């Protein structure tokens, strides 16, 4: 089973494909990861279209079965929150077009499932990702956040 974790952003949407074979949820493998980058010199419509087309290509390339994403978080800056909502909307549409079910988790639940602490810092989450997947957690936090939400989903499935 291939699971995609997504960290939404209009600037840099992080994604990670994790694989679990034969329902062995103790053996999680990182298949691939990356970021969908958009330029703030483009129109919002062009940026959203890039997110849509790149995510659709990723979903088709890796035969993704399910998706996971953090629940929406509204911050104090209304403009930032609005732009995040635009990106999330396109991500939801893309998953729907590809017929991929989405599972959403709160940020605290993701952190708690990875580190045991719902208020863990991003560095602690990265440290645990390195231990769980036996990889080096480098790059940007949008990718590690995507990996974390995918692991959270796998752990949620395993619990049932």
Curated annotation (Swiss-Prot):
GO cellular component entries: cytoplasm; Holliday junction resolvase complex
UniProt catalytic activity: Endonucleolytic cleavage at a junction such as a reciprocal single-stranded crossover between two homologous DNA duplexes (Holliday junction)
Keyword Disulfide bond carried by entry: no
GO biological process, one term: DNA repair
Gene3D superfamilies per UniProt: Ribonuclease H-like superfamily/Ribonuclease H
Cofactor: Mg(2+)
EC number annotated for this UniProt entry: 3.1.21.10
Binding site for Mg(2+) 2: 70
Active site: 7, 70, 142
Pfam families attached to this UniProt entry: RuvC
UniProt keywords, alphabetically: Cytoplasm, DNA damage, DNA recombination, DNA repair, DNA-binding, Endonuclease, Hydrolase, Magnesium, Metal-binding, Nuclease
Residues that span the membrane, as ranges: none
Cofactor note: Binds 2 Mg(2+) ion per subunit.
Keyword Magnesium in record: yes
Signal sequence coordinates: none
Binding site residues for Mg(2+) 1: 7, 142
Single GO MF annotation: magnesium ion binding
Compartment(s) of residence: Cytoplasm
Family listed: Belongs to the RuvC family.
NCBIfam families reported for this sequence: ruvC
HAMAP family recorded: RuvC
Subunit structure: Homodimer which binds Holliday junction (HJ) DNA. The HJ becomes 2-fold symmetrical on binding to RuvC with unstacked arms; it has a different conformation from HJ DNA in complex with RuvA. In the full resolvosome a probable DNA-RuvA(4)-RuvB(12)-RuvC(2) complex forms which resolves the HJ.
Function as written in the Swiss-Prot or TrEMBL entry: The RuvA-RuvB-RuvC complex processes Holliday junction (HJ) DNA during genetic recombination and DNA repair. Endonuclease that resolves HJ intermediates. Cleaves cruciform DNA by making single-stranded nicks across the HJ at symmetrical positions within the homologous arms, yielding a 5'-phosphate and a 3'-hydroxyl group; requires a central core of homology in the junction. The consensus cleavage sequence is 5'-(A/T)TT(C/G)-3'. Cleavage occurs on the 3'-side of the TT dinucleotide at the point of strand exchange.
Protein name as annotated: Crossover junction endodeoxyribonuclease RuvC
């Amino acid at each position: 089973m291939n699971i995609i974790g997504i960290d939404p952003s209009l600037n840099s949407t992080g994604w990670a494909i994790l694989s679990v074979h034969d329902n062995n949820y103790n053996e999680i493998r990182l298949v691939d990861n990356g970021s969908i980058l958009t330029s703030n010199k483009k129109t919002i419509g062009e940026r959203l279209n890039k997110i849509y087309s790149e995510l659709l290509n990723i979903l088709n390339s890796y035969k993704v079965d399910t998706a996971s994403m953090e629940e929406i978080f509204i911050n104090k800056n209304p403009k930032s929150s609005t732009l995040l909502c635009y990106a999330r909307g396109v991500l939801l549409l893309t998953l729907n077009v590809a017929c991929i079910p989405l599972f959403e988790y709160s940020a605290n639940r993701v952190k708690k499932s990875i580190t045991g602490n719902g208020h863990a810092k991003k560095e602690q989450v990265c440290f645990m990702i390195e231990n769980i997947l036996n990889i080096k957690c480098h790059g940007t936090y949008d990718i590690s956040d995507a990996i974390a939400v995918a692991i959270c989903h796998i752990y949620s499935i395993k619990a049932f």
